[in-house]
Amino acid sequence: MKKDIIEFEDIIGRYFNLKINNQNYRIYVEEAGSGIPLICLHTAGSDGRQFRHILNDKKITDKYRVIVFDLPWHGKSNPP
């Protein structure tokens, strides 16, 4: 039997739009898993990629819905 050569990760990435004080923000978020929400906030000058290992950790995503977002001006999120 031929083994699959492509293996997809369970991470889902998408954008959401947020309006605060008449200012529009387009924020990129990735999530994986189900259960108790676990929100990961990246450090200054970085983006959500620093949590890639958590998003791919089955021991964590079996118990938690891991949510990672890029702050405005970081990663895939646009400036306001």
Locations of the language-model features?
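Conserved HGGG/HGGXW glycine-rich cap/lid loop of the alpha/beta-hydrolase fold
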Residues: 28-76
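Alpha/beta-hydrolase fold catalytic core
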Residues: 1-38, 61-64
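Gly/Ser-rich "nucleophile elbow"/oxyanion-hole loop immediately N-terminal to the catalytic nucleophile
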Residues: 80
